[in-house]
A protein has these predicted regions:
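Class I SAM-dependent methyltransferase SAM/SAH-binding core
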Residues: 114, 118-164
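Short coil turns that delineate tetratricopeptide repeat
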Residues: 14, 44-47
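Short alpha-helix
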Residues: 223-239, 245
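Short, glycine-/aromatic-enriched active-site segment of Class I SAM-dependent methyltransferases
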Residues: 206-224
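A short glycine-rich, Lys/Arg-flanked "PGG" loop and its adjoining helix->strand segment in the class I
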Residues: 188-203
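A short acidic, Gly/Pro-enriched loop at the edge of an enzyme's catalytic core
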Residues: 166-175
Length: 267
């Protein structure tokens, strides 16, 4: 879509986040990094906004910004999400959740699995061999396109997590949220939604960044941190039990480990 078309769509519906995201991308492709940042500032943080923000800042710092250079930089960046997550950010959340699964549900196979905030499908890829059915949900249409291209999911939905969980649908033996809850503050509604979709012997496995004190807080990178006390309390309120809660490092930022938790909840 052209910039003018997207701006027109946003005048008609200012809450259309998909159009906002595409507008930020369009400004970047046009070499207008500052304008792209202005649009990104109006969006909730997500893996994709972080990716685009990083690209915009790279462009602003770049000595040359001719159209060909910008297009090359953008295409390279958009296509390399997985490489960036695993390489530059030391993203290990799927591996951490696999280890946790082997502890709390050893030997389980042929599972119905739901991947919350599936992104490009990195967690789905890690768990595919345990799945009889693998479904995914993500807020970003572009991420879902990449996940679909892997050919590992049975069903993919573009939706926010609470909406997807509230709908009538199958029950799951395993619900995954790898590095997803850092984009949500209060987890009460999602925990309640998951509780309603878990099979009697089902598990929710997730990673989160560690917060201080009793509750949850917004960190400097616009990523939410949750305290152990909050996670335990929110689980109980949703009618879930804590089957496991261990210290973990789901990712690195600027070479430094980000402290977090790997958590297993069950019915």
């Amino acid at each position: 879509s052209s910039i003018s078309e997207l701006q027109r769509a946003l005048r008609l519906d200012p809450d259309m986040d998909v159009a906002r995201l595409r507008l930020a991308q369009a400004w970047l492709k046009a070499g207008e990094a500052q304008r792209a940042l202005g649009v990104l500032d109006t969006l909730e943080a997500s893996p994709q906004t972080q990716m685009l923000e990083q690209l915009a800042r790279t462009m602003l710092a770049a000595p040359r910004s001719d159209a060909g250079y910008v297009r090359h930089l953008f295409d390279q960046f958009a296509g390399d999400y997985d490489q960036r997550m695993i390489g530059q950010l030391g993203y290990t959340a799927p591996r951490i959740l696999l280890d946790l699964a082997s502890l709390v549900m050893p030997g389980r196979q042929d599972l119905a699995i739901l991947d919350l905030g599936c992104g490009t499908g990195l967690a789905g890829l890690a768990f595919k061999s345990f799945a009889a059915r693998l479904d995914g949900v993500d807020l970003s249409p572009l991420m879902v396109e990449k996940a679909r291209a892997r050919g590992i999911y049975d069903h993919l939905v573009v939706a926010d997590l609470e909406t997807a969980l509230a709908e009538q649908g199958p029950v799951y033996d395993l619900v995954l949220a790898a590095d997803t809850f850092v984009y949500l503050g209060d987890l009460a509604a999602v925990f309640a939604g998951v509780a309603g979709r878990l099979a009697p012997d089902g598990f929710l496995l997730f990673t989160t960044e560690a917060g201080e004190g009793e509750g949850f807080e917004l960190g400097p990178k616009r990523r939410w941190r949750h305290s152990e006390a909050y996670l335990r309390q929110a689980a109980i309120k949703a009618g879930l039990q804590v089957a496991g809660l261990v210290a973990a490092t789901p990712r690195h930022e600027k070479g430094q480990p980000v402290e977090g938790f790997a958590v297993a909840l069950c019915r």
